[in-house]
Amino acid sequence: TGIKAKFVFMDMFLQDNLSDLVRNMGFSDEDIIWLYSYFTDLKIAPTTYTVKDLEKEIPYDITRREINGKVVKLFCTKEDIFYAAYLRKEGEDIVHRVEKVSRGCLIRKDFYSYTKMFTEYYTPVDNKAHLYQRRFFNEDGSIAYDEIVDGKDSVFRFPDKILSSKQEFIAYFM
């Protein structure tokens, strides 16, 4: 008794905020360690990023808005870009992730909690979006580390270290 348990999650969570998931399972944010945020100074926390926050960050004129269920699309016609904001719940203003599509091609996904947690970068290959990099951030927006993705293989690049596989990444965590 008296020993505080921590639960370590080692998978990527792309569809939902980890805080929302673990709270639904009865855990508190403080009980959780996420492998990918462990090397940042971010806390496990609910999403508070809003569509208005996104609108302030878009450097182009937003010429059209579409709302379809949990997705809000913001179009910048002159630049041939649109942003698809995926809401935590339909009818809310809280954004879990944003996809940036340029000239019909997905080029970036940004994932949020109380700040931007990480970004995925894509390039078109055979008319499909191909993930080639994830960048993980600290609270102040500085880069904590990068994951360079090549299919199922990854290389993790830290300011002072390069880890050549997910196994090395997990071993470094341990």
Which ranges hold each PLM region?
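Repetitive, compositionally biased segments used for assembly/scaffolding
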Residues: K56-Q167
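Long terminal segments
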Residues: T1-P46, D53-E55, L131-M174
